[in-house]
Amino acid sequence: MTRSEALFEQAKKTIPGGVNSPVRAFNGVGGSPLFIEKANGAYIYDADGKAYIDYVGSWGPMILGHNHPKIRAAVLAAVENGLSFGAPTELEVQMAEKVISMVPSIEQVRMVSSGTEATMSAIRLARGFTNRDKILKFEGCYHGHADCLLVKAGSGALTLGQPSSPGIPEDFAKHTLTAVYNDLDSVRTLFEQYPTDISCIIIEPVAGNMNCIPPIPGFLQGLRDICDEFGALMIIDEVMTGFRVSQSGAQGYYGVTPDLTTLGKVIGGGMPVGAFGGRKDVMQFIAPTGPVYQAGTLSGNPIAMSAGLAQMEALCEEGLYEKLSAKTKRIAEGFKAAADKHGIPMAINYVGGMFGFFFTEQPEITRFDQVTQCNIEQFRIFYHGMLDEGVYLAPSAYEAGFLSMAHGEEEMRLTLEAADRVLASMKAAS
């Protein structure tokens, strides 16, 4: 038994399922999860001391690589002054100014402690501002575990949502409508059914929780136009894509302007953090300037602000995103080339520092129903083959992969050579 396996057995005695977030349990791929002891650059090291080239990056935040010296120095300097004050700090102001300078649609921003807090608060604000109860989300998109968001579509386009988890009253779920990602007609159908009831659309601009699904041309702007037509707010959830896809997020990359934006992951530099921001008139509707309540003991935590600021400043380096995109393209297209070489059907998607691959004969993947038709068993085999080769991918066929600036020529070469060997063995076994 490895030390990771022993720790997992020990953890299950005191932690539900042995993990503090379900995907970490490896239920999507089978086997026991790795317990991580440390990380540096493009590598993570498990409890047995084995190194892995990491394409999870703490699920997105580690865009510069693990344990980056500038971020580490910023955190250590901040710790000297105390860990938490529960009062305003100059660091919060600096972070707000940095975010606003990088994302033109954000005129004011409020810091919180997680992505779930950010989306939950943005939706409450949209409901309060519009005085409407219903929200519209998309099948396959994930916006955190707030009750109103753990909702799946009903049996028809016009049916009300159904809870996707026990513990969520149907009275909550009935206010959440679910449309088809990359399908404007499904959105318009719902708005025509509820023309004065929908407060907002919330969307992942690149869906990163059904693997990696970019928007088709015109989709995001089409949502913007529908919101304007029916008086709803557009919330772009950039918890994953913010400063990961481009310096101004996915909204800058695709040229669409939301009313509200949610942020997380990258803006914390690896520390727990979230934020939501947008139009000043909307943001002024939140307490203490407005009637919509939102608060948090650790919001704007000085350690998190220090780490985030250090990372955000580093991301302003000229040419950084072009380099990151080139790395992502090389890995995604390298996987596809290796699969083609061995006669294994595969589709790929990638944008900025995110990528996804699908074992499927479908030529392209643009919707959730297409994702569910992919070969999950082939993914599991590939996943464990790559893990044995020292490459750590997301342990789920429904999660995006992430590159960092620390992934160099050596790491990419080793990764693609490993993929070639694993795919060759999969073909031989078939």
From Swiss-Prot:
For this protein, the Enzyme Commission number is: 5.4.3.8
Task: Specify whether Isomerase is a keyword of the entry.
Answer: yes
Q: Spell out the InterPro entries in the cross-references.
A: 4pyrrol_synth_GluAld_NH2Trfase (IPR004639), Aminotrans_3 (IPR005814), Aminotrans_3_PPA_site (IPR049704), PyrdxlP-dep_Trfase (IPR015424), PyrdxlP-dep_Trfase_major (IPR015421), PyrdxlP-dep_Trfase_small (IPR015422)
- What Gene Ontology terms describe what this protein does at the molecular function level? glutamate-1-semialdehyde 2,1-aminomutase activity; pyridoxal phosphate binding; transaminase activity
N6-(pyridoxal phosphate)lysine: which positions carry it?
Answer: 265
Q: In which pathway does it act?
A: Porphyrin-containing compound metabolism; protoporphyrin-IX biosynthesis; 5-aminolevulinate from L-glutamyl-tRNA(Glu): step 2/2
Family to which this protein belongs: Belongs to the class-III pyridoxal-phosphate-dependent aminotransferase family. HemL subfamily.
Gene field: hemL
Write the protein's name. Glutamate-1-semialdehyde 2,1-aminomutase
Required cofactor(s) = pyridoxal 5'-phosphate
Q: How does it assemble?
A: Homodimer.
The biological process GO terms on file are:
protoporphyrinogen IX biosynthetic process
A cellular component term (GO) from this record? cytoplasm
Where in the cell is the protein located? Cytoplasm
| Major location category of this protein | cytoplasm
PROSITE patterns assigned: AA_TRANSFER_CLASS_3 (PS00600)
List the catalytic activities from the record.
Answer: (S)-4-amino-5-oxopentanoate = 5-aminolevulinate
Give one Pfam family, short name only.
Answer: Aminotran_3
- Source organism superkingdom: Bacteria
Q: Membrane spanning segments where?
A: none
Top-level class of the enzyme under EC nomenclature: isomerase
Q: Which UniProt keywords apply?
A: Cytoplasm, Isomerase, Porphyrin biosynthesis, Pyridoxal phosphate
Give a yes or no for keyword Isomerase in this entry: yes
